């Protein structure tokens, strides 16, 4: 169990545009404390070592020896080949708007369980995501502290890897649809 306050975060709102007019014009960044960041970095470094073996090859972001541009190049090749052979083609492009905010913690834990992560690992990750509290910095002054209910924090070293695990669930569903002939895959 994490010590109370260890998982506290200040959320700073960084403008995305020159003259922000509404909340969507800001990007929330989590400013986590040093002790939590060290703990999260240790866990993230361990996840980094095994992430390539637990997620599909089609996932390329944040994975050692994989290039994020590979997906774009493969998609381009598939479209070119389909045009040349006059085959019908449907592509799925998933836009993860507010991607980290959308991750449900129980879903993440379920995915990790299905991937056979040890119970202790799942408990550590759950402690890191489920015990977080935050305060928004408004004009440099913090608001009242509140518990975070879902999502992953921008700026947390674990977030990219946990998001990959959550996204792998969608990848597994897409593969199942192909295996059940609901969609036909395109061989590259």
Q: Where does each model-flagged region fall?
A:
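Nucleotidyl polymerases of mobile genetic elements and RNA viruses
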Residues: 1-188
């Amino acid at each position: 169990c994490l010590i109370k306050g260890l998982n506290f975060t200040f959320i700073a709102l960084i403008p995305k545009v020159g003259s922000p007019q509404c909340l969507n014009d800001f990007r929330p960044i989590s400013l986590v404390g040093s002790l939590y960041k060290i703990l999260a970095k240790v866990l993230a470094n361990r996840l980094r070592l095994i992430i390539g073996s637990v997620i599909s090859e089609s996932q390329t972001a944040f994975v050692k020896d994989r290039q994020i541009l590979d997906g774009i190049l493969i998609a381009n090749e598939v479209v070119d080949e389909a045009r040349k052979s006059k085959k019908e083609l449907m592509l799925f492009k998933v836009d993860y708007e507010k991607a980290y905010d959308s991750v449900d913690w129980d879903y993440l834990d379920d995915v990790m369980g299905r991937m056979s992560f040890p119970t202790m690992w799942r408990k550590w990750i759950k402690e890191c995501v489920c015990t977080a509290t935050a305060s928004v910095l408004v004009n440099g002054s913090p608001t009242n502290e509140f518990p975070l209910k879902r999502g992953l924090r921008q700026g947390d070293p674990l977030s990219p890897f946990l998001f990959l695990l959550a996204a792998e669930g969608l990848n597994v569903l897409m593969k199942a649809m192909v295996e059940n002939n609901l969609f036909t895959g395109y061989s590259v």
